[in-house]
Amino acid sequence: MKDMERMTKILWIASIVFIVLSGCTSPKAQQSELTLSGLNPINFETIVNGNQFTKLYTLKNSSGMEVCVTNFGGRIVSIMVPDKNGKMTDVVLGFDNITDYQNIPSDFGATIGRYANRINHGKIAIEGQEIQLPQNNFGHCLHGGPTGWQYQVYEASQVNDSTLILTMNSADGDNNFPGNVIARVIYTLTSDNAIDINYSATTDKTTVINMTNHSYFNLNGNPSQLATDNI
């Protein structure tokens, strides 16, 4: 009888252990499939401003090119293309997680807006009215101000393997720029290993718009070497 009770207890404990282990997820299972550039998409998932979700989107073409984009700032995170010897190489600088993009001031790969580059003394004149913009760079307005579009979350729609559409709404008075603006960026990979970036914007007031991408390139994929060494 004691042996029977002992066996029953062992089986009961074994069952509990099995259930607990079955409910656990191994570190390998928690990790998403890595991109060709070695990025883990999970490291780009977070919530900004309470209700805006960030993600990493992976674009590919028929030739094997891969481009990773996060909807935080519409940023290109990596571009994997074959070099002259056919070796796949990441030719842009960037971070491997969303936290660094949030906490380390940079324009790596970002979609810049409303206005790329500097506006002298942060002043513009529209329809006879002078508007004072934030002076966030030595007395001038740089890249749309301190909270430019490179720090905003875009709505993302990946329509196919090689095309991503990013959209954002910029309210009237955003960094003191006039007009409600709906901005759109379309990233498309072509079959000949090029990336096409198409910008468009609509507004309900006269305003200034000058969008661009702020990627930093190094063609041999090694940021410790000068780009001039590849020419």
Label each residue range with its predicted role.
Residues D3-W12:
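Bacterial N-terminal signal peptides that target proteins for export
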